[in-house]
Amino acid sequence: MLEGDEKQSRALDFNRLEVLSLLGRGAKGVVFLVRDDDAKLLALKVILKEAIEKKKKGRESEDDEYKRVSFEQGVLSRFDHPLFPSLHGVLATDKVIGYAIDYCPGQNLNSLRKMQSESMFSDEIIRFYAAELVLALDYLHNQGIVYRDLKPDNVMIQENGHLMLIDFDLSTNLAPRTPQPSPSLSKPSPTMKRKKRLFRFTSFCNSGISPQESISVHSSSTLAVSDSSGEKSNSFVGTEEYVAPEVISGDGHDFAVDWWSLGVVLYEMLYGATPFRGSNRKETFYRILSKPPNLTGETTSLRDLIRRLLEKDPSRRINVEEIKGHDFFRGVDWEKVILVSRPPYIPAPDDGGDKGTDVNTKMDVENIVQEIFAARQEREKQSGDNNKNANMKIKDNTSGEWVKGLNNNHDLESDNNFLVF
C-alpha cells in the first residue's frame, strides 16, 4: 500500500503520558496535548468505543467503523514523509481507543487565512502552500491512497513552517495511479533543511488545526473500471463544500476528486470563501454540479489553474503532471520544495508550558471523552443538526514571524478556532 512495511506501533501507557490540555474535539474523537516520557509533545486522538458502537444503529456497522479507525492507524504507521504525521503509539482501554501523532503548535491553513486583514493570501503565499499540497497528494496517489477530505482545516502548519496533512479516516485504497516511484521524500535532516530556498520569501512560518465536519454517508463498494487508476470508489464521503461533482452524482470516483478539492482550497485562499457554498447542503450540491466558479478579477495563471482544477468532468480535469507544468508553478523546483528553509510563516516555539489543566489521568481522559460525547448526542437530539462545529476553543497561537507582505492583523473574535479530527 504505502512505501515500506507497516511499523509495529508501540503501546501507549497513560501512566507515562503527561496530559497538558484539551486541544479540541470532532465527530468521532477528542484530541489532547500530551508529553511523553521523552519530553516530546504529541497530539493524542482519543475515540470513545461507545461512539463507534452506536454507529451500527446508523449508516455504518460497528465493524466498518473499527475498520476505518484501523485503516487510519495503518496508514499513519507507514508514513515516512515530511508532509505527513508519524504515528508515535496507540492505546486501548475498556472505554476508549486512541493514537498519538506529531503535534503542530500553530494554526491550520484556515485559521492562518482568517488572520489576514481580508482573509485572503497573496498569490506568492498560495504558490508555496499549493506546491506542498500537490506534492502531498501526489505521494498519496502513487501509493494508491485517495485522500477524499482535503480542506484547510485538515492542513496543519508545522513548527518549521511546512504543511502537514492530517485526518485519514475518510481515505481509501485504490490501485496506484501509476507505477512510477515517488522521488525520495523521507524526512530531511536538519542540515538539509537549512540549505535550500526556493521561493522569494524573507521570513519564517506557522502551524495549526481546525473544524468543519465531514459527510460520512458511506456506501463503501469499489467498482473496477478501465481507467488510469484501475478502479473507482462509490462511497459518498467528504466535506460538503469541498466534495467533487462525481461523488455527489454517484458515478464512482478516483484520485481526481482530490484535485477538485485542491481547486476549492486554492479558490478559498484567493477569495476568502469557497466557490459553491449555498444556504443549505442541497443548494451547495446543486451549485457544485451545475454552476461554474466565479473567478472574478484579472486573468492570471492562478485563476486559470483553479478553473482547470474545478472542471466538473473528472476525465477532463487537470492531472498532476499538467499541474506541475502549469504556468502558476513556473520556476518551481519540485525536488527542493520541502527543503525550503524559510516558508511564509513560522509559529512561536511551544514547549507545552504550564497549561493549568486538571486532566492528568486515564480516568480524567475517559470521563472527558464520555462527557463530550454525551453532550454531543444531547445537542443532536434537540437540534437534529449533525453538522454543527464543535464549541471547543483552542489557544491563540498567532505569535510568530511573518514574511513581508503576509499580514498578521486579525480580529480577536476569529480566535474561536476549532480542532476536528
UniProtKB/Swiss-Prot annotation:
User: Mutating residue 45 to A: effect?
Assistant: Abolishes catalytic activity
Domain Protein kinase, residue spans: 17-329
Q: Does the keyword Phosphoprotein apply?
A: yes
Which keywords, in A-to-Z order, does the entry hold? ATP-binding, Kinase, Nucleotide-binding, Phosphoprotein, Plant defense, Serine/threonine-protein kinase, Transferase
Expression by tissue: Expressed in roots and root hair cells.
Q: Provide the activity regulation entry from the record.
A: Activated in response to hydrogen peroxide and cellulase elicitor. Activated by PDK1 in a phosphatidic acid dependent manner.
Q: What GO biological process, any one, is recorded here?
A: cellular response to hypoxia
Q: Which SUPFAM superfamilies does this chain map to?
A: Protein kinase-like (PK-like)
Q: Which residues form a coiled coil?
A: none
Where in this chain does the record put each AGC-kinase C-terminal domain? Answer: 330-421
List the InterPro entries: AGC-kinase_C, Kinase-like_dom_sf, Prot_kinase_dom, Ser/Thr_kinase_AS
UniProt short sequence motif PIF, positions renumbered to this chain: 418-421
Q: Which reaction does it catalyse?
A: L-seryl-[protein] + ATP = O-phospho-L-seryl-[protein] + ADP + H(+); L-threonyl-[protein] + ATP = O-phospho-L-threonyl-[protein] + ADP + H(+)
Chain's role: Involved in oxidative burst-mediated signaling. Required for basal resistance to P.parasitica infection and root hair growth. Partly required for the activation of MPK3 and MPK6 by hydrogen peroxide and cellulase elicitor.
Please give the record's comment on domains: The activation loop within the kinase domain is the target of phosphorylation.
Family statement: Belongs to the protein kinase superfamily. AGC Ser/Thr protein kinase family.
> Which protein are we looking at?
Serine/threonine-protein kinase OXI1
Identify the species of origin. Arabidopsis thaliana (Mouse-ear cress)
The major lineage groups are: Eukaryota, Viridiplantae, Streptophyta, Embryophyta, Tracheophyta
Gene for this chain: OXI1
